[in-house]
Amino acid sequence: MLKSSTLLRYLLCLIGILLSIPILALVTLAFITPVTVSGILYLFGSILLASGLILTPWQLKTRNALVLGGLIVILSVIGLRLYLTLNETSNLKVIVLPSTRGTRSLNALIDEQDTLLFGEGLLHLIGGVSPHEHEGLALAVTAAYQEARVANGVFSSPVLSTYIGFQKPDAFDVVVIEPSAERPSPVGIIFLHGFTGNVSIQCWQIARAVDRIDAVTVCPSTNWIGEWWLPEGEAIIRETFGYLREKSIQRIYLGGFSNGGGGVGRLISILADEPELSGLFFIAGVRNAQAVHETGLPVLVIQGANDERIPVEAARQFVADLGEGVTYVELEADHFLIMKQTQAVQEAISAWLLEQEKTLK
């Protein structure tokens, strides 16, 4: 009969083998996906740790060295990311509402670029992202993160908290990006994410357009599906309106991407009572033209002509049903136009916001 110590060593070996499966998958993706320095170090530390565990039944000294080395690498990356992120003084913050406390430490552990690109690469391999959508996306996303790091340093992301299921009305992550102006305008933008959850980089891309009117951009988080029309989603939006109200924001523009845009359309009949609501914008996601029309609010619709998820015909019909008071911008782009056609999307948002602010003033 095997001794308990021997059984434990073989159990650790089995754990190492099981850990090596996702690690090898990530290493394979790393050869075709741009990876950050912290991502590379995490992979290296994980390889050392898994290798040490696998060798446990036979090479105890080697096991100890590998496991210790792996843990040192992983914990060092965690410590450095926590220090850099939680002490960052940029305009991009990830806070928890409604308590308005600082970011969850969990949100600082992994670079968002790695989670986004590894996730997209996996979805592409299993058919969740089409070849046309996949083409050029990694390069566009990598370039966006490079620009964001220059402007903001190391920043947090709500991705991990979202997939663990932490986004609830009593505690949800919000990406808040203050304008660059020393004296911001009393204007705020609420931007709702779509399917796969909230990411700081998308909020930052929208905020760069919003900065033209010196307004604050806030991007709340709900579940990763982006089901804003559920009671929890509506409650999160209401809390976000309240947050901006407490900041003395007088005019609020509400917009969304994909499921976020659909959420705006499905909820607008009950959100129309928010006194600060001044306009709506939809990016690759439209719904409920009649209810939107009844608000009498100005509307911006941005749509990709080659969108495989939201047919361009649906956007055109939505615009036709709205009639007057709508600005329609159609781009030669697929569903991921915010990342692939960033400048065109930002210019459309900036021009529309400037026009609305000029009219209101």
Q: What name fits each language-model region?
A:
Residues E227-S248, R266:
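Alpha/beta-hydrolase active-site loop
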Residues T295, V301-Q303, D307:
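Short beta-strand/loop motif that positions the catalytic acidic residue
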Residues C203-Q205, P311-A320:
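Short alpha-helix in the alpha/beta-hydrolase fold that links the catalytic acid
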Residues L7-R183, G262, I270:
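A domain-start/cap signature at the N-terminus of enzymes
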Residues E182-P186, F191-E227:
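Short substrate-entry loop that stabilizes the transition state in hydrolases
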Residues A333-Q343:
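Catalytic histidine-centered segment of alpha/beta-hydrolase-like enzymes
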Residues N306-I310, F336:
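Acidic catalytic loop of the alpha/beta-hydrolase fold
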Residues R251-T295:
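Primarily recognizes the serine-hydrolase "nucleophile elbow" in alpha/beta-hydrolase
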